[in-house]
Swiss-Prot record:
Descriptive protein name: Erythropoietin
Organism whose genome encodes this protein: Homo sapiens (Human)
Compartments, as annotated in UniProt: Secreted
Glycosylated residues (UniProt): 51, 65, 110, 153
Disulfide-linked positions: 34-188, 56-60
Gene name of this polypeptide: EPO
Similarity comment: family membership: Belongs to the EPO/TPO family.
N-terminal signal peptide: 1-27
Broad class of the protein's primary localization: secreted
Presence of the UniProt keyword Ligase in the record: no
Amino acid sequence: MGVHECPAWLWLLLSLLSLPLGLPVLGAPPRLICDSRVLERYLLEAKEAENITTGCAEHCSLNENITVPDTKVNFYAWKRMEVGQQAVEVWQGLALLSEAVLRGQALLVNSSQPWEPLQLHVDKAVSGLRSLTTLLRALGAQKEAISPPDAASAAPLRTITADTFRKLFRVYSNFLRGKLKLYTGEACRTGDR
């Protein structure tokens, strides 16, 4: 059986096995993110990370304010946006969220007694964000974000701050459930991606 004869389910399985490692999914179908099970896996990980920090006070403080994307969505305005504008907002939000989680990871590593369950979920979030970035790049989100039709009218990314890992993971979870899911749904529906 040649590479080109490989069934689609095998590509999906191989791709999903590569995702937790944060490795680029080379040779995978470019629309893998369009499979709802893929995004649901990341949503589940984000929700687990948020849940692990419930009631956690001592180990869950970031000891500084970290800037994260505001995850509120005005659905009326979102539906009226061009896909390119949506891509800009998602791409900028994903980049800022990745920076925030990496900063949280650095703070946790430098703490005197990092809490292992928290460290595990932070590491998973870093890996997940890298994989999502790769999947969005394969979908063409980066290309759309660089050259939307009316880039001059793009509003600056709204931000908030997180001072605990719970809030950081809540933003992560909400971003995936909100803007990322809305964007990928629209981008996957259109046939020219």
